């Protein structure tokens, strides 16, 4: 198992003007500066509005976010919103595009946002592209693997070669928003040029976050199997980040 040293910055500060930062590489200290601060710019006490995504669209100067699940008239709901800076203040606007059921992670794609749509008990999820301006038209990019519906697509990243990499755990089933899984929990790569969709890595409990290194030679995938969709936590299961070189295409050789 790999190990890494880290530094803790501002461990005692808990106010909105201070923050605690775990620094695994000294280069990050240059980004933080001598007196790093965390500032609360928006807050919503009615529901957990800022849970996933966090996609900045430079053309509109807006950040797109997705909420965690909450109840609306007794039914589970996830809200898509966009944050825009107005002078020294920030405003949040709820947006309800068609065709993005239970949105979760997202990434910049083309001129807009590529959402992970987890799906519903009766409709499949997948990857859905949304234009960033009204009327927020959407287009399904993927919604199945070899004819079988995805479990509940969770997070996504786009490589500079145009390929789309994403994770597909079973959280939707455990949270009772998706039917019983038809596929294992794996990492996929979709070649947008050829249409080829393949499994890049398996053996995960619940593959979750995914990201590339700046040079794109490495991909990082978190496995959050310890956190059950029903809220229970099992410390005997994986709470791990895996790393794999992308140079071993078409498959990944992951390590901790």
Q: Language-model features: where?
A:
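Sequence-structural signature of mature extracellular/luminal beta-sheet repeat domains
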Residues: 1-256
